[in-house]
Amino acid sequence: MDLRAHPTHPDRRIQLGRLQRSEHGQRRHCFAISLLLILGPGLSCAAELQPETLAAWNHYIEQAKMRMNLRLDAGSHFLWLDEESDRARRVRRGEILVAPVNGSGRTEVPNGLIHDWIVAAFFPDTTIEKVFVTTGEYACYKDFYKPTVVESKLLSTDGSESSFSLRWLKKALFVTTVMDGDYKAYYLRRSEKSRYGFVWSTRIQDVVNDGQSSELKLPPGTGSGFIWRLFSISRFEERDGGVYVELEAIALSRGVPPGLGWLVNPVVSRLSQSSLVTFFSQTREAVRSLPQRAGLDSCGSRSSVLRARSSK
């Protein structure tokens, strides 16, 4: 089945679309304060998303979706875990595997940087329905993913496709970056025991003075450049007494100033891996706690939404 055949598939939804300092010390100080793209640069380090950066991002996402298409072909590995036998064994022992999709996990594009990582784990003693139900509890993300996600709302759903919003923050040393965004999620059933899906951002904005009377959302494509776009591909397969879950997480950010790659790139890689391991650990715990949440509506109109989603 061609993923792009569906009228609401991301193929039809995603639109195509220096840091320069005269003194080396100023450039180093500006980017050091932003702590390697993660801390969020100050106003003097503001970045703006350029058309050529967005075009490169869209091309990259098209390639990622083509790779997903190939995984659906007969004789191909649906799961990244199955490409090497040791991977499945390791996750069954409880490990959460994180690896760059290509090379270092970073691809330089004009005036930007694409980060592409895959994370995989085994959720024991559960079913694909329970995992799928849990990942669809968008209103509960503020509870699942504390302290990173501080607000989460389900905006709409028709079962297979949902819209939701998140406000999340990242703290490092003395700087906090707050991002507010809207997202769409679209899932398909591959078989009775396997599914896959896509989540992509439709709006991401930097938030200044979060929670204060002077709070301000900067226009999309401006601000810190910490995150401009997000896209993910997830795969689920039930077997061996549990569910294998993997996620390819792709992000677009501002680029690294010339001469600072040696300082920035290793830290960005470590933070990327750490964030994905934490995310999957929290997801696994949310699946485990599903029986305790059964019948509760504390996260919004969960019951009707999840019945519709799991029936697709």
Where are these regions (language model features)?
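Compositionally biased, low-complexity segments
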Residues: 18, 30, 306-307
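Eukaryotic helix-grip
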Residues: 47-312
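Ala/Thr-enriched low-complexity intrinsically disordered regions
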Residues: 5-8, 32, 232, 308
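N-terminal secretory signal peptides that target proteins for export/translocation
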Residues: 1-27
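Bacterial N-terminal signal peptides
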Residues: 30-42
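Short intrinsically disordered, low-complexity segments
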Residues: 9-12, 36-38, 309-312
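Intrinsic disorder/low-complexity segments in short proteins, especially the signal peptide
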Residues: 8, 20-24, 41-42, 301, ...
